[in-house]
A protein has these predicted regions:
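An N-terminally biased module of ancient metal coordination in phosphate/nucleic-acid-related enzymes
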Residues: 1-60, 152
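Residue-level detector of solvent-exposed, low-hydrophobicity positions
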Residues: 14-18, 44, 72, 129, ...
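Short hydrophobic/charged patches on amphipathic alpha-helices used for structural packing
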Residues: 34, 90-91, 155
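Active-site gating/metal-coordination segments in enzymes
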Residues: 52-148
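Short, intrinsically disordered, charge-balanced linker/junction segments flanking boundaries
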Residues: 154-160
Length: 160
């Protein structure tokens, strides 16, 4: 049986992230992750891309990872600043073979999934036949707003 890690984040080497990895008996590196994947017979992973819309930021080893371009709170400034060219930037990712979808973070951005700003993103995902993943439920940030990421809010978008 082939195992795929369907949701992971890769963070640059920084004192905080490196210490967190060491605290649970690991190293914060792709090389270490490759080793652990081999030991656990995990054949591939899907990186939930964060922190940037620059395509150059999302250069993961293709034999090991695909990625979803993430529209997180750093990209959308917690919903305060949505770039006018957001659809164009997202499309550049969706054109790439190693990009397998888009990830939305409504609770962190305080943007309803039914907000007009997301419609071009949904349309692009449909055009490129790639899924939209959505961070629903509890968040890792205490100042995120759960009302935006309650599972029932997805119903409005998915059912309509």
């Amino acid at each position: 049986m082939k195992i795929i890690d369907a949701h992971l984040h890769i963070f640059p080497s920084e004192p905080g992230t490196d210490a967190m990895a060491r605290g649970v008996g690991h190293e914060n590196s792709v090389e270490h992750l490759r080793q652990v994947y081999g030991e656990l017979e995990i054949v591939h992973g899907v990186v939930m891309g964060n922190r940037s819309l620059e395509t150059g930021f999302h250069n993961y080893p293709r034999d090991l990872f695909h990625y979803c371009v993430g529209l997180d709170s750093l990209v959308l400034d917690r919903g305060r600043n949505i770039p006018a060219d957001l659809p164009d930037q997202v499309e550049e990712h969706l054109k790439r073979d190693n990009c397998c979808g888009v990830k939305l973070y409504p609770g962190y951005n305080r943007i309803w999934l039914s907000d007009d700003c997301y419609q071009p993103i949904y349309d692009l995902a449909a055009r490129y036949d790639k899924p939209v993943a959505i961070h629903m439920g509890l968040t890792a940030f205490s100042r995120a707003h759960l009302k935006y990421c309650h599972p029932l809010t997805l119903d409005e978008v998915a059912a309509d």
